[in-house]
Amino acid sequence: MLFRSAGASVTHVDASKGMVAWARENAAASELADRPCRWIVDDCAKFVQREIRRGSRYDAVIMDPPSYGRGPGGEIWKLEDNVYDLITLTEQVLSDDPLFFAINSYTEGLSPAVMEYIVKTTLCPVKGGHTHCDEIGLPVSATGGVVPCGATAIWEK
């Protein structure tokens, strides 16, 4: 939403029709319904493959993939098994001078160090730049602590 509010053209892709509908509702509630956005219900990897064939390029990519999912034919998708290929594929649609790439992971199987390693070994050799990674956590008001629930990795020039 932030990028739409700044005037960026946004493409939102999710395999779940319900998630795309929810994102549209959030855009409307944020008074951003009139800003440019392509709302696409599709498998993200298949969408990226088509964008590669079309020659489409993006200055920034934000990924928030599920930890686990099933395709329409019952195929099982696990982030731990597919994250490397998904990032490698997505690198091909980044522009020649991209701004950043960010990915979140909500699985215990991908620590911040692992996420950073994957992003560093897939994007840095091709695009240069640097990475940073951190843990995603939920604050616990009763104790003041934080419950770890995933990792985020960001690449930028």
What is each model feature region?
Residues 6:
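Conserved dinucleotide-binding and phosphotransfer motif residues
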Residues 9-14:
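Conserved SAM-binding motif I beta-strand of class I
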Residues 16-62:
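S-adenosyl-L-methionine
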Residues 41, 59-89:
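Mobile active-site "lid"/loop adjacent to the S-adenosyl-L-methionine
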Residues 50-52, 72-74, 113-114:
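Short, well-ordered secondary-structure micro-motifs
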Residues 89, 94-101:
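Short glycine-dipeptide loop
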Residues 98-157:
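C-terminal catalytic and target-recognition region of SAM-dependent MTase-like enzymes
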